[in-house]
Amino acid sequence: MSTVVVKGNVNGGVQQPRRRRRQSLRRRANRVQPVVMVTAPGQPRRRRRRRGGNRRSRRTGVPRGRGSSETFVFTKDNLMGNSQGSFTFGPSLSDCPAFKDGILKAYHEYKITSILLQFVSEASSTSSGSIAYELDPHCKVSSLQSYVNQFQIPQGGAKTYQARMINGVEWHDSSEDQCRILWKGNGKSSDTAGSFRVTIRVALQNPK
């Protein structure tokens, strides 16, 4: 008895699964693979800053090349308990040659915008008395007339004047004084009182 093996396209035959696998492979090969484009994240756009018309005025109060702003410090030493005197701020300020004989002569106009008056005590703890001081914003007074404001000689103290108090809002000709501070002590002539330390801020314009 012989055995016959039939190879054909009979449904349910042995070759049917292989043909399906080949067809499946062909379909996969014919499929178009999608291409994914990956782009790097872009740089954030920079917003252009708008320049204001008064940018220079925000940077500095005085236009470059037309004016200047300076600070000066000077002292009045060896004050006794009964010393008296005055500071005249402007071309008459002999206690500050760097201002009077220096930069003030290089400009036509100036204005002192602040004054810091400090009394530094050098007195002993047993000393007594005080130093009265007065602001004259228009240089009309030649001697102390008010004793309301005082520095206690053993303690010292400080007083700040802003522009509106010292006639420092408007510009002044460099040949005229702006304001004056007068002072007078009521202590003993034999007692050492201390010294004044004065700081002024000055704006200048219209160079010569």
UniProtKB/Swiss-Prot annotation:
Stretches for region Disordered: 1-69
The compartments listed are: Virion
Compositional bias (Basic residues) at which positions?
Answer: 17-30, 44-61
Please give the chief subcellular localization of this protein.
virion
Q: Which Gene3D superfamilies match?
A: 2.60.120.20
Q: Which InterPro entries does the UniProt entry name for this protein?
A: Luteo_coat, Viral_coat
Protein name, entry field? Major capsid protein
